[in-house]
Regions:
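A post-motif C-terminal structural segment
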Residues: 1-117
Length: 117
């Protein structure tokens, strides 16, 4: 939320390590679903190549708060094929629940929009 490029890089490296632990654990199992998704996008980070060859990349921000950009969904394991690359966040817990045998969400909680089936 602070539009801090250094923190973006260090946090993403730590996040990558954590996700790899989860993926390694789930690898070869049929009872573990790994879902990686953000609750929102913040800042509208943009990366350019700099002004000349050999210069560092430049970063910029288009906003200081949440943006309307969709968030990506990455998943592996049971029912992961039901999770699209982008979808309404409200559908994700419903799809995860399918792995627990929950199929009746009630009429007000049915899957809707992109990613619905």
């Amino acid at each position: 939320h602070n539009n801090d490029g250094y923190r973006v890089v260090t946090e993403m490296l730590d996040f990558e390590t954590a996700v790899q632990v989860a993926v390694d654990f789930a690898s070869g199992r049929d009872d573990t679903l790994v879902v990686v998704v953000a609750d929102h996008e913040t800042g509208g980070l943009g990366i350019t190549s700099g002004s000349a060859y050999g210069t560092s990349a430049e970063i910029g921000w288009v906003h200081t708060g949440h943006t309307g950009s969709p968030v990506a969904v990455y998943s592996c394991g049971p029912n992961s094929v039901l999770l699209g690359s982008h979808m309404y966040l409200a559908n994700i817990p419903k799809i995860i629940s399918l792995g627990w045998g929950v199929t009746d969400f009630g009429p007000e909680r049915e899957l809707t929009g992109p990613g619905a089936f």
